[in-house]
Amino acid sequence: MSQPELKKSKVDISKTITVLPGDHVGEEVCNEAIKVLQAIEDATPYRNIKFNLQKHLIGGAAIDATGTPLPDESLEAAKNSDAVLLGAVGGPKWGTGSVRPEQGLLKIRKELNLYANLRPCNFASDSLLELSPLKSEIVKGTDFTVVRELVGGIYFGERQEQAESEDKQTAWDTEKYSTEEVTRITRMAAFMALQHNPPLPIWSLDKANVLASSRLWRTTVDKVMSEEFPQLTIQHQLIDSAAMILVQSPTKLNGIIITSNMFGDIISDEASVIPGSLGLLPSASLASLPDTNSAFGLYEPCHGSAPDLTENKVNPVATILSVAMMLRLSLDCVPEAEALEKAVGQVLDSGIRTGDLRGSSSTKEVGDAIAEAVKKVLNQSV
């Protein structure tokens, strides 16, 4: 990773971040992310940066306090911020009733038009290769990003449950996509591919041999790529075949993976196992192309709320790397993002790790170490 290029001229930057800790470990990981943001405020040597942090409720915590998983106050705060940092939502306490924590997450995605979910899959440090459930020689060099369409498809389609009797019930969900939705997510994937030199290849995953929605998906992707991005490489892969490749030889899918809401949900969770822990993987959900490094976005770890995990045991790295994505894509703080990613790698290499990475450090100890490391990286680069 290249060293951040920092200039010495003073520039003032003020950014507002809505923090939605959510449930269980969400509060802990958000606290460590805030710690790192404050360290960057203190350390950035060539400009004054101020992160205005505002905490609000979402998920089960919001249900307990207000009866709704996404209070209007939380939504309005998110709409008026530069970016949103989310911890995790859900847990068995709230069950699967008519009001559920996950409804808050679905609603905020829809209300903020967060149509593109980006989930990188790589190794923050080669020292983590041995932790993968796959052989090191198979996973070494894995580096792809899943670009998942987030506000369409079967999760937002019409659904129905009918019961003629206790023994005879029927239920269905509807998968629906428009050319506009597929065009928009294809452009996001192409933009991400073009941020690299040479540009990254793009893999489009669907089930076009069976589903009408996938056939529309494939023809639309082809049209957009041929007309707008002829310089990029696009390959189509059936989702079941891609799931197999991901286990057999994940580096074959290196580049940008574009897929629908449900397929993206499944394939990105499968991919999250490759680095050895969900506690390592960040994500970003964007409302527009980050072409000026100022796209509005929501950032969260790929892991859930982990209600069974005792205090100070959760790995904060995924949330901290989500902050790095936020700095790069939404807050126009690219040098700070690079410094933070470098700091995370240094800390992991030093052996300061939580239990999921066969370490003995606590959540706070990892957060403290990364905060100190990013200060040193920033100050050394002047």
From Swiss-Prot:
Its cofactor is Mg(2+); Mn(2+). Signal peptide: none annotated. The record marks 155, 207 as: Important for catalysis. It is an enzyme of class 1 (oxidoreductase). Pfam families: Iso_dh. NAD(+) binds at residues 91-102, 304-315. GO terms for molecular function: 3-isopropylmalate dehydrogenase activity; magnesium ion binding; NAD binding. Mg(2+) binds at residues 240, 265, 269. GO terms for cellular component: cytosol. Pathway: Amino-acid biosynthesis; L-leucine biosynthesis; L-leucine from 3-methyl-2-oxobutanoate: step 3/4. It catalyses: (2R,3S)-3-isopropylmalate + NAD(+) = 4-methyl-2-oxopentanoate + CO2 + NADH. Binds 1 Mg(2+) or Mn(2+) ion per subunit. Its EC number is 1.1.1.85. Its main location: cytoplasm. It is found in: Cytoplasm. Keywords: Amino-acid biosynthesis, Branched-chain amino acid biosynthesis, Cytoplasm, Leucine biosynthesis, Magnesium, Manganese, Metal-binding, NAD, Oxidoreductase. Substrate binds at residues 109, 119, 148, 240. One of its GO terms (biological process) is L-leucine biosynthetic process. PANTHER family: 3-ISOPROPYLMALATE DEHYDROGENASE. Homodimer. Catalyzes the oxidation of 3-carboxy-2-hydroxy-4-methylpentanoate (3-isopropylmalate) to 3-carboxy-4-methyl-2-oxopentanoate. The product decarboxylates to 4-methyl-2 oxopentanoate. Belongs to the isocitrate and isopropylmalate dehydrogenases family. This is 3-isopropylmalate dehydrogenase. It comes from Debaryomyces hansenii (strain ATCC 36239 / CBS 767 / BCRC 21394 / JCM 1990 / NBRC 0083 / IGC 2968).
